[in-house]
Amino acid sequence: MAKTLYEKLFDAHVVFEAPNETPLLYIDRHLVHEVTSPQAFDGLRAHHRPVRQPGKTFATMDHNVSTQTKDINASGEMARIQMQELIKNCNEFGVELYDLNHPYQGIVHVMGPEQGVTLPGMTIVCGDSHTATHGAFGALAFGIGTSEVEHVLATQTLKQGRAKTMKIEVTGNAAPGITAKDIVLAIIGKTGSAGGTGHVVEFCGDAIRALSMEGRMTLCNMAIEMGAKAGLVAPDETTFNYVKGRLHAPKGRDFDEAVEYWKTLKTDDGATFDTVVALRAEEIAPQVTWGTNPGQVISVTDIIPDPASFSDPVERASAEKALAYMGLQPGVPLTDVAIDKVFIGSCTNSRIEDLRAAAEVAKGRKVAPGVQALVVPGSGPVKAQAEAEGLDKIFIEAGFEWRLPGCSMCLAMNNDRLNPGERCASTSNRNFEGRQGRGGRTHLVSPAMAAAAAVTGHFADIRSIK
């Protein structure tokens, strides 16, 4: 029987399945950070249980960390407690931790892939909704809650029901300057922010194959923003070349044997999906969100939509509420909308390819007066690579702030946040009300588009910036 990639991954990890029972899955990798793990470790301690597979569990600090200093006290009392608890828990339970002073420290979904913790064919979980990122490698990766974190720590398994399947095919070739961020925002604009609910999405098509691993990670990272459980891209030579030689990747003959297995991780001819969505890459322009969910998105050349243009009453009401919160008027060109802050970073867009794209725009230019622009590399290795290439100097000379690794302004859990009413061009993944700070207004864009907004002071079409 022909199977989809998701079905192959799921079936390969079923430990036990009984009629009318939720299947029990084996978990290959468990990623841990400071925010969703303290209660889980407390649960182990209360029941005198060890971590079942400490060698398959990897921890880092990211959500709460300061991006201006490595001082654990810098982000406030709650952040300090959570980070100190993580240090204590990892020491006690034998879990490898990339703490503030470790060269590999960074955002959990950047650290995992770059250290070879993430490999094709695996099941990967983390107490974080954007765990879908790792699906770029052909791994079944999804976020879990704190009680599930405890269950995986204790048993290396998790009860998980089968999801529906969705194929999103992006055909043709994207125009120069169009990135994975533009592609995935265009997809969410088509499906809506709940269009993938109950599904695991497989991204395919020529435009997807043409993406680097960084681009595929951006794509899968935002699968959750269309309501999907997880996102997948079947592994290929691009995947194998990225993984080869990384710290935790197989070596020598083991790697060659692994690749032979990984090559089987693709949807069979004749396999059927519950839902199919198609887009043409050449029709995708640079994207900017205008509302308060990622599905409220338009091309940079478009005007702010009129709520009256939405036939669905729920969408119309949502648009009215979003425009009121965002302080926008229908009919205004996006390129007339001024910004206060720019954030280049997050688990969506903080990898070396993202920073190169932003630096290309920033080079020889200056951040517009009155704009604060932050560049936050996703990990220690990304920061070191960027500095080796001189990207930090380009940013600093242009007036951007070059920061230490962390989740930063993606979410208001550290010192990097918006003030009420401030408008931000952000490369992160969520533009919900208050996501970047109470009353803050978030517009999601690609790194190049964020840099363009920084140097012009408003949204600008990257294709028109020479």
UniProtKB/Swiss-Prot annotation:
Top enzyme category: lyase
Alphabetically ordered keywords of this record: 4Fe-4S, Amino-acid biosynthesis, Branched-chain amino acid biosynthesis, Iron, Iron-sulfur, Leucine biosynthesis, Lyase, Metal-binding
Pfam families named among the record's database cross-references: Aconitase (PF00330)
GO molecular function: 3-isopropylmalate dehydratase activity; 4 iron, 4 sulfur cluster binding; metal ion binding
InterPro entries associated with the record: 3-IsopropMal_deHydase_lsu, Acnase/IPM_dHydase_lsu_aba_1/3, Acoase/IPM_deHydtase_lsu_aba, Aconitase_4Fe-4S_BS, Aconitase_4Fe-4S_dom, IPM_dehydratase_rel_enz, IPMI_cat
Catalytic activity: (2R,3S)-3-isopropylmalate = (2S)-2-isopropylmalate
Names of required cofactors: [4Fe-4S] cluster
Function: Catalyzes the isomerization between 2-isopropylmalate and 3-isopropylmalate, via the formation of 2-isopropylmaleate.
Subunit note: Heterodimer of LeuC and LeuD.
The name this protein goes by in its record: 3-isopropylmalate dehydratase large subunit 1
Organism: Salmonella typhimurium (strain LT2 / SGSC1412 / ATCC 700720)
